Curated annotation (Swiss-Prot):
One of its GO terms (biological process) is translation. Coiled coil: none annotated. Keywords: Ribonucleoprotein, Ribosomal protein. One of its GO terms (molecular function) is structural constituent of ribosome. Pfam families: Ribosomal_L32p. One of its GO terms (cellular component) is large ribosomal subunit. Residues 1-15 have a biased composition (Basic residues). Residues 1-23 are annotated as: Disordered. The gene is rpmF. This is Large ribosomal subunit protein bL32. It comes from the Bacteria. InterPro entries: Ribosomal_bL32, Ribosomal_bL32_plant/cyanobact, Ribosomal_zn-bd. Belongs to the bacterial ribosomal protein bL32 family.
């Protein structure tokens, strides 16, 4: 016979939410860092292709 599961406690729910939000914050921080390095021209850790047509249009 099917039995309903126990309710997840608020503490566990908040802990999972904090972990999820923390991972998102780290990803956002890394994205901002990469964006800043690309704009400043100091990007060394990855290849950022720049086509000549984009420069001509700007």
């Amino acid at each position: 016979m099917a039995v309903p599961k126990k309710k997840t406690s608020k503490a566990k729910r908040n802990q999972r939410s904090a972990t999820w939000k923390g991972k998102a914050a780290i990803a956002a921080k890394r994205a901002m860092s990469i964006g800043k390095s690309v704009l400043s021209g100091r990007a060394q850790g990855f290849v950022y292709p720049v086509s000549d047509t984009d420069e001509a249009e700007a």
